[in-house]
Amino acid sequence: MKKMRLMSLSLMAALAMAPAFTASAQCKKAESSCCKKNTDACCKDAKQEGVYTQDYSNDPKLVKAAQKWYKKGKWRNGFKKADAHSSVNLVDFYLQYQKNPEQWKALFDFIAKTDLLAIPGGKHPIPGSNLTISVEDSKNNPLEKRGSESHYHHIDFQYVVKGVERFGIIDHLTSKPNCKYRPDVIHYDYDKSRARFYDSTPDKFFIFFPGDWHIAKIANDTDNQDIRVIVIKVDYKD
């Protein structure tokens, strides 16, 4: 019994090191904007909708500023091959770009000027930065063989340049960590019926921030599961 208690305390301590991974704070914030009205129906609706990313709806000026910034396009730094997928949290993108412009500029400059189909597979340094691009020639797999994850210290920039990769984003309200936080990743048990799925093609890129608990390389509905995807981990700035 004492050993089990120590293990439980150890897991709790590990999770406490990664506040972005615990659903409670995110869920309470998401529900509070609705539930402060003290209506059971409103609370029920909030839970039914789920929580899939950081919520900024209580700051409409910030949301509008982020949308305007994205549309203006200076962030592209010459990159015009693809746009952000509709699931990308534009406020997180906007805020993180302002806090860490050097890495983001280097990222977009590199993928704008590089033939991403011709570059050899493997990891390559991005000039003028401490970033590394991982060029992965891989295959999608059935959902049950893929794990969910999120990261606290890094942001996943993922861009499929060949083929179709299916991504999943899981609901915070019905998910819970199933392991210790190991820098810089944690995994979850989740309700598949509450997950949202998106197919990524070469005209869109995805960005997964700490509040985006995701699943990658899920099999799509076609006969071809071969993909080439680039993954760049950008530092997350508090």
Please identify what each model-predicted range represents.
Residues M1-Q54:
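Bacterial Sec-dependent N-terminal signal peptides
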Residues G50-Q67:
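N-terminal leader/propeptide segments of preproteins
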Residues Q67-S134, K145:
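A short, N-terminal "cap"/entry segment at the start of jelly-roll beta-barrel domains
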Residues T132-S150, E165-S175, P210:
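Conserved short histidine dyad/triad with adjacent acidic residue
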Residues H153-E165, D171, Y181-H187, K233:
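Short, conserved beta-strand element in jelly-roll/cupin
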Residues K176-D199:
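Double-stranded beta-helix
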Residues Y198-A219:
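Conserved metal-binding segment of the jelly-roll/cupin
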Residues F205-F206, N224-D238:
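A short hydrophobic beta-strand segment most commonly corresponding to one strand
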